[in-house]
Amino acid sequence: MAVMKFTWRSIIPRCSKGIEEPEAEAEAEPETKKQDSKQGSFSRLAMIDLSYPSSRFTEDLSTSLAGSNLYVFTLEELKVITQCFSSANFLGEGGFGPVHKGFIDDNLRPGLEAQPVAVKLLDLEGLQGHREWLTEVVFLAQLSHPHLVKLIGYCCEDEHRLLVYEYMPRGSLENQLFAKYSVPLPWSTRMKIALGAAKGLAYLHEAEKPVIYRDFKASNILLDSDYSAKLSDFGLAKDGPEGDKTHVSTRVMGTRGYAAPEYIMTGHLTAMSDVYSFGVVLLELLTGRRSLDKSRSPREQNLAEWARPMLNESRRLARIMDPKLEGQYSETGARKAAALAYQCLSHRAKQRPKMSDVVNILEPLLDYEETSVGTFVYTVPTHQNGGSPPKDDTDTKECEAKTELKKENGDHHNRHHHRRSHKSRDGHRHRNKSSSQSSVHSENYTSKQTLENGSNEECNID
């Protein structure tokens, strides 16, 4: 089976047909910009080039994009890789379409190493379409970073549109946090994931031609075997504003619960829109709650609106921390992470930090050791008379917990040894108890529809 090396001449004539009209930001063809000397002869193709047949997008760009290393697969090859898209290899389904696990062997193509892959098939009746497929190919062909998922190749055959990615064995952050039988993520792992995702966003925002991700959420953060985070699903990504422009005007797309309020209201998209979404995910990591959960009381359904007022008060913060952590986290680290989430969720976009600043704040948090926080020894009260506990019951138990921690200081060595053992079992603690759990690009995929209390929807946000 022959696999062709990627060239833009092979994809443009067949796969640029049916491109939608440019959105509001593409009012006029931009002037050709001089290439940045730092980038040498490389200049990333902007998505706006898709809208103009006379532009350089119709030329052979294989020279300037020679380092992309994408492969063009045939549909028959992908059928072999996935065993005819067998239900046994089905990983799940998102807005783009179904995802199947496959395996590329050494005989498929010299130079293409044997490896497991995830094959995503565009559902022609799904939420996304050809433009989103092409957007993902164009962006991931040109962007490379340790915290972006790797696109290995694609298939564009008749009406079929498929993408072939590296396989991410730990699945998505959404599944790790919210799947019914998932093992709780330790505090240190949560901060590692947050930092990795932040680095991915910072890379996009600070590129020569900035990219706005536009759909940052827990289900789009995939995890490798070491829980290193990688951003996936670039179908809604947009080129950032250039020159003296402050924003990109576009249709409001994304996922409820994650989208920035000013973007929903105006359609004005900036890098700060991604920062807000990052703040929501950071809140999910802190609290173990979904960004939008209709199973909760009306006041608590929107996580950002409910939790943000409590992020700057230590005592209130302790009450909203994920109970699955069982009090095993760094108090100082939690306060700093909560303060960062508070800034990211500011309703004034200009007051949010840049993602590069977010990275600088998160990096030191990985060095904080997990300790047993007072709320860990909280015991659920039982009232034989059916009455309610006194209002200060929680505060009293927190004081008792702190007193108990002081008594444990003499046994500090044993607790420190326990923490080391706890970390050494990190890999074991994260093995799913059910092989049916999953996330996009992984055997651990669980579709949004099957996750309990799921209410996030990818859609036009009216």
From Swiss-Prot:
Q: Which annotated residues bind ATP? A: 91-99, 120
Q: Which tissues express it? A: Mostly expressed in roots and, to a lesser extent, in leaves.
Q: What is the effect of changing residue 172 to A?
A: Normal phosphorylation
* Keywords recorded for this protein, A-Z: ATP-binding, Cell membrane, Hypersensitive response elicitation, Kinase, Membrane, Nucleotide-binding, Phosphoprotein, Plant defense, Serine/threonine-protein kinase, Transferase
GO MF terms listed in the record are: ATP binding; protein kinase activity
EC numbers, comma separated: 2.7.11.1
Primary role: Required for pathogen-associated molecular pattern (PAMP, e.g. chitin and flg22)-triggered immunity (PTI) involving reactive oxygen species (ROS) accumulation and triggering plant defense, including defense-related gene expression (e.g. PR1 and LOX). Ensures specific recognition of the EPD1 effector of Verticillium dahliae, resulting in a hypersensitive response known as effector-triggered immunity (ETI), characterized by the activation of programmed cell death to limit infection by the pathogen.
Describe the effect of residue 421 to A: Normal phosphorylation
Name its species: Gossypium barbadense
Catalytic-site annotation from UniProt:
215 (proton acceptor)
Name of the protein: EPD1-interacting receptor-like cytoplasmic serine/threonine-protein kinase 5A
Q: Where is this chain primarily localised?
A: membrane
Organism lineage:
Eukaryota, Viridiplantae, Streptophyta, Embryophyta, Tracheophyta
Q: Which residues form the Protein kinase domain?
A: 85-366
Q: Which reaction does it catalyse?
A: L-seryl-[protein] + ATP = O-phospho-L-seryl-[protein] + ADP + H(+); L-threonyl-[protein] + ATP = O-phospho-L-threonyl-[protein] + ADP + H(+)
